[in-house]
Amino acid sequence: MNKWLITSGVMLSLLSANSYAVMGKRYVATPQQSQWEMVVNTPLECQLVHPIPSFGDAVFSSRASKKINLDFELKMRRPMGETRNVSLISMPPPWRPGEHADRITNLKFFKQFDGYVGGQTAWGILSELEKGRYPTFSYQDWQSRDQRIEVALSSVLFQSKYNAFSDCIANLLKYSFEDIAFTILHYERQGDQLTKASKKRLAQIADYVRHNQDIDLVLVATYTDSTDGKSESQSLSERRAESLRTYFESLGLPEDRIQVQGYGKRRPIADNGTPIGKDKNRRVVISLGRTQV
């Protein structure tokens, strides 16, 4: 991070592409206005929001996934009219005027889109807020070429909500919808019991379904190996399918969102002439559908 040995009082003139001082608009919550709110706190998503008066909202979000992730969006009441180069600077708070400003990075905000920052830079913004500083976005006003816009995030009342946000991230599920949307599970060689690994996978699916109100369809298809005759295989397959229907209903899913089908020993995916092939054929395929928002 490069340090600019300047105070916040002269930031606007030095950020200008011209050699002369420019007028600027600055959007920031006063200490009395500053709010941070956890608007989503579930095992699937965490969202921390900071309203910026007369401008919009600063939104940090993280979602259930194999990897820890963080997105930052600067949601604007009025979208960008033109694409602009943006300087992201860490500014001292008003009560520490003698401190220097630190350049964090340069970005682009694109026409008709909210501002977006991801990855390490988004984590860096949180880090600056935790230090009590004001991360500030500065760019040329697309409506007035001789004017710059400054949008700052206030660190007032940030820490307690940030602690809650950090706790939420730590408790996110370690898999996403895409990881479980199509799953093949396998049964033990005798009876209706899933293998140990399959039981663990089914429990993961259950955790996701419990916390996601957008799951609107569960498709279950069960298959057997060729050990039994056609009638016995079909009966076993249907029994397994109905058992899973009951399981998903116990999670709170309406009956009309669950479709199950037993196929018996039809549609093998491996050679039933070997134990390994039979193990692969004794399976259930679970597909999830959800409403996209």
From Swiss-Prot:
One BP term from GO: archaeal or bacterial-type flagellum-dependent cell motility
Gene3D superfamilies on file: 2.60.40.2540, OmpA-like domain
Compartments (UniProt record): Cell membrane
Keywords: Cell membrane, Flagellar rotation, Membrane, Signal
Signal sequence bounds: 1-21
Residue stretches making up the OmpA-like domain: 175-292
Matching Pfam families: MotY_N, OmpA
GO cellular component terms attached to this protein's record: cell outer membrane; plasma membrane
Membrane topology: Peripheral membrane protein
Described function: May play the role of a stator in the sodium flagellar motor, stabilizing the force-generating unit through direct interaction with the cell wall.
Protein name: Sodium-type flagellar protein MotY
Gene source species: Vibrio parahaemolyticus serotype O3:K6 (strain RIMD 2210633)
